[in-house]
């Protein structure tokens, strides 16, 4: 009998629900509903509308129920670091802050005045970024935030949504690891860091790993959706964790690039790699499935283009890619990870101003802006990959690009040109596939991650890009390193 697995995949700009099932020869995915996920700006702060996300999930479940389809289980993954605060009565105390909120500017330095940067990194192996949950929580503590002071529980976004569906509070390992609150060696919440932000382990839900059952739909949700007591399974709650589980690699000599709003480049390791070098380069060790560690670097990704598109109306990606392809190469380059691109009011203007202040031609046409973004991303990927090669316990012979960005032929070719090794693109739905596969492993439909990857490689169309024009890209890389600030 065919089993359907309901995957909820929420990104920082959009979300969707997907029904996955196994068919002869592979995996079938059907999108049930897709919806925007917008920042809400109120009083100079940025929040997520978790109630809207919950409503969209309920809508997806109702659509499946209306068709008479059965669901074997449900899994939820989201972006990282953001969280919900619950009172003693189990109710949400307010909408969660979004990680792009400016209140964490300078937060790491404030925290390190009490516990040193090296000590924090030595425990967690997580790269230092302003918006890590550790620093968000410490910012709220220092600001005497009323919601934090009243909070009984802290739930990360995927865990908060599973709580709204099941009434059960959990803390899933991969999403907690990303938060910089988990000891990378013990794979448990780190008591010293919790104490530093005024919390204890009791302020979090039951600690679970991917593949564990969270609970079943509450009677209320069953009544609203018309479904039964369907189990909700902890997948890799951090979307990158689910995505990397779906990398269609047949050996381990690969790096991955999860390409979406963020670009996350890394390798899989069997143990944390926490050294003076990884600390200096600000690489992160995030928890993965089956006990693996994702040694990776966060790179700003399609956020740059997504924000530019806000000014460009309904222009499609193919149109923009065609315009970029016809523009002069290497005219202007930026550092995608410069702070000025974190959340500017006008991304186009921020890019132009960066080029102006670094003495480069200022992009005027839309195609020039897009080409600047793509070339700069590809060259930044090369820079990060060079560091990754020095840190990886295995050689890197292929780069697997997964996620929505894997559909971008021009950027994929630029990336192959820049890094000098083959780029294998796909699947674009890696996060949803990983989500479904982890659910399927729980009920025995799939055996292990290696078997999952073989199935994906056989059943999902992939495209390989080989390096071209390497001399020109080598020269551009020198220019890139000289002009980034």
Curated annotation (Swiss-Prot):
ATP binds at residues 12-16, 261, 306, 404. The keyword ATP-binding applies. Gene3D superfamilies: 3.30.420.40. Disulfide bonds join 355-372. Its EC number is 2.7.1.5. Pathway: Carbohydrate degradation; L-rhamnose degradation; glycerone phosphate from L-rhamnose: step 2/3. Keywords: ATP-binding, Disulfide bond, Kinase, Magnesium, Nucleotide-binding, Rhamnose metabolism, Transferase. One of its GO terms (molecular function) is rhamnulokinase activity. The active site is at residue 239. GO terms for biological process: rhamnose catabolic process. Substrate binds at residues 80, 238-240, 298. Involved in the catabolism of L-rhamnose (6-deoxy-L-mannose). Catalyzes the transfer of the gamma-phosphate group from ATP to the 1-hydroxyl group of L-rhamnulose to yield L-rhamnulose 1-phosphate. This is Rhamnulokinase.
């Amino acid at each position: 009998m065919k089993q359907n697995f309901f995957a909820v995949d929420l990104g920082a700009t959009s979300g969707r629900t997907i029904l996955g099932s196994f068919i002869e020869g592979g995996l079938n995915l059907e999108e049930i509903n897709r919806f925007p996920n917008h920042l809400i700006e109120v009083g100079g702060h940025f929040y997520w509308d978790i109630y809207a996300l919950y409503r969209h999930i309920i809508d997806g479940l109702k659509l499946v129920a209306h068709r008479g389809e059965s669901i074997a289980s449900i899994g939820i993954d989201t972006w990282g670091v953001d969280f919900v605060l619950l009172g003693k009565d189990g109710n949400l105390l307010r909408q969660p802050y979004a990680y792009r909120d400016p209140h964490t500017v300078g937060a790491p330095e404030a925290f390190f005045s009490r516990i040193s940067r090296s000590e924090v990194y030595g425990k967690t192996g997580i790269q230092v970024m302003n918006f890590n949950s550790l620093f968000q929580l410490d910012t709220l503590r220092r600001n005497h935030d009323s919601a934090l002071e009243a909070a009984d529980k802290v739930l990360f976004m995927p865990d908060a949504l599973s709580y709204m569906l099941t009434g059960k509070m959990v803390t899933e390992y991969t999403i907690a690891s990303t938060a910089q609150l988990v000891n990378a060696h013990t794979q448990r919440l780190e008591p010293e860091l919790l104490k530093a932000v005024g919390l204890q382990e009791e302020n979090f839900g039951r600690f679970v790993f991917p593949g564990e059952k969270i609970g079943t739909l509450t009677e209320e949700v069953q009544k609203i959706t018309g479904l039964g007591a369907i189990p909700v399974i902890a997948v890799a709650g951090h979307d990158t964790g689910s995505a990397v589980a779906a990398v269609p690699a047949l050996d381990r000599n690969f790096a991955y690039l999860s390409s979406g709003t963020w670009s996350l480049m890394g390798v899989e390791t069997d143990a944390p790699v926490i050294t003076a070098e990884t600390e200096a380069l600000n690489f992160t060790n995030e928890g993965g499935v089956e006990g693996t560690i994702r040694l990776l670097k966060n790179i700003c990704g399609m956020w740059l283009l997504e924000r530019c598109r806000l000014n460009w109306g309904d222009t499609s990606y193919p149109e923009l890619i065609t315009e970029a392809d016809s523009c002069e190469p290497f005219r202007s380059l930026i550092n995608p990870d410069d702070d000025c691109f974190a959340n500017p009011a006008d991304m186009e203007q921020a890019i132009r101003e960066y080029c102006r202040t670094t003495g480069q031609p200022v992009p005027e046409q839309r195609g020039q802006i897009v080409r600047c973004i793509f070339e700069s991303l590809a060259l930044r990927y090369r820079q990060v990959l060079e560091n990754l090669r020095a840190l990886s316990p295995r050689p890197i012979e292929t780069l697997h690009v997964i996620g929505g960005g894997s559909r971008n032929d021009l950027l994929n070719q630029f990336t192959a040109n820049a890094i000098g090794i083959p780029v294998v693109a796909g699947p674009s739905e890696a996060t949803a596939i990983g989500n479904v596969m982890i659910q399927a492993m729980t009920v025995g439909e799939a055996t292990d991650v290696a078997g999952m990857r073989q199935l994906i490689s056989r059943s999902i169309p992939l495209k390989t890009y080989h390096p071209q024009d390497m001399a020109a890209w080598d020269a551009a890389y020198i220019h890139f390193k000289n002009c980034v600030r």
